[in-house]
Swiss-Prot record:
Its cofactor is heme b. This is Cytochrome b. One of its GO terms (biological process) is mitochondrial electron transport, ubiquinol to cytochrome c. It comes from Caenorhabditis briggsae. Coiled coil: none annotated. Gene3D superfamilies: Cytochrome Bc1 Complex, Chain C. Changing I222T: In strain: ED3092 and ED3101. It comes from the Eukaryota.
């Protein structure tokens, strides 16, 4: 069916008539699920913003007001809180799937995806601070102070973000505005990510590169994406039965600038990076290692190699990389004491070693098998 409207024609080409391989599995649902969760987070977050007050004296109490006084406010708050965890679960599955199938060969898709990941981490951190609880307040103090390692301008940048000489109500307003606006920038980059992907196709080893052996995206894969409904049902049930199991008990205590928690721990989806940061006693080197834990994957897109040799070795190393990431996440929430202070540097070295080994295999496979 021909559509004359240019906007509808664009949407039709992306969601209906897009030529798609017959062999894509359910692991290709992660992207569509991420899009659904992103929209879900924007909707629930907008509702919460109606009642939230970005003031250091009222922020914590307005969160309690939403929970206890606003009609169905507790549902929106619980779903928004757990929706962030659901988003990161599928985001990490999406990234690991990309490593598994060497998706970094699609340079624009890979680079835009990593940029989305960095922005989402910033977005989640700022949302975490908005509760203005004891743990989130001190997490804001620790993380923002890391910017002071930037040569020359570092202390000035920290003072500018804090709007003073410490994390205050002005910092809270700054984070609230960015937390409200950043999702729209993420949506824009997601659109670019989608366009780049659909203009080149997938990197699955089963992928068919001729349009003669493909099917339209709808209804074949629209129906397959309907399996996401099962995930949503599980998410709703778990959120209602265990609403705060993924949080910290300190998040129920109002922020006290005069007393820090015994053990500062970020949300679970930042723990692997936090473990790498703590593994290095030097502040500057720790921040560099923290950044490189993510920035390293940008280097994959700089290699001009479109072959897919050594795929079995690549998949084996990806599984080892996933295991090391999970162990680092566990170490990130452990106390700073033996044996964890020994294990964290060890698994940080393994993490980077596997990442650069994957990069090295990707670089050399073309030379070995050309």
């Amino acid at each position: 069916m021909k559509i004359n409207n240019s906007l509808l024609n664009f949407v039709n080409g992306m969601l209906v008539t897009l030529p798609s391989s017959k062999t894509l599995t359910l692991s290709w649902n992660f992207g569509s699920m991420l899009g659904m969760v992103l929209v879900f987070q924007i909707v629930t977050g907008t509702f919460l913003a109606f009642y939230y007050t970005p003031d250091s004296l009222m922020a914590f109490s307005t969160v309690q007001y939403i929970m206890y006084e606003v009609n169905f406010g507790w549902i929106f708050r619980i779903f928004h809180f757990n929706g962030a965890s659901l988003f990161f679960i599928f985001l990490y599955l999406h990234i690991f799937k990309g490593l598994f199938f060497m998706s970094y060969r699609l340079k624009k898709v890979w680079m835009s995806g990593l940029t989305i990941y960095l922005l989402v981490m910033m977005e989640a951190f700022m949302g975490y601070v908005l509760v203005w609880a004891q743990m989130s307040f001190w997490a804001a103090v620790v993380i923002t102070s890391l910017l002071s390692v930037i040569p020359i301008w570092g202390p000035t940048i920290v003072t500018w973000i804090w709007s003073g000489f410490g994390v205050t109500g002005a910092t809270l307003k700054f984070f609230f505005v960015l937390h409200f606006l950043l999702p729209w920038a993420i949506l824009f980059i997601v659109l670019g990510h989608l366009i780049f992907l659909h203009s080149t196709g997938s990197t699955s080893s089963l992928y068919c590169h001729g349009d003669y052996d493909k099917v339209c995206f709808s209804p074949e894969y629209i129906g397959k994406d309907a399996y996401n409904i099962v995930v949503w049902l599980v998410f709703i049930v778990l959120s209602l039965i265990y609403p705060f199991n993924l949080g910290d008990a300190e998040m129920f205590i109002e922020a006290d600038p005069m007393m820090s928690p015994v053990h500062i721990v970020p949300e679970w989806y930042f723990l692997f990076a936090y473990a790498i940061l703590r593994a290095i006693p030097n502040k500057v080197l720790g921040v560099i290692a923290l950044l490189m834990s993510i920035v390293t994957f940008y280097f994959f897109a700089l290699v001009n190699n479109y072959t897919s040799c050594l795929t079995k070795l690549n998949k084996f190393l990806v599984f080892l990389f996933i295991i090391s990431s999970v162990i680092l996440s566990w170490l990130g929430q452990c106390m700073v004491e033996d044996p964890f202070t020994v294990l964290s540097p060890l698994f940080s070295v393994i993490y980077f070693g596997l990442a650069y080994l994957l990069l090295g295999i990707f670089m050399t496979s073309k030379l070995l098998f050309k």
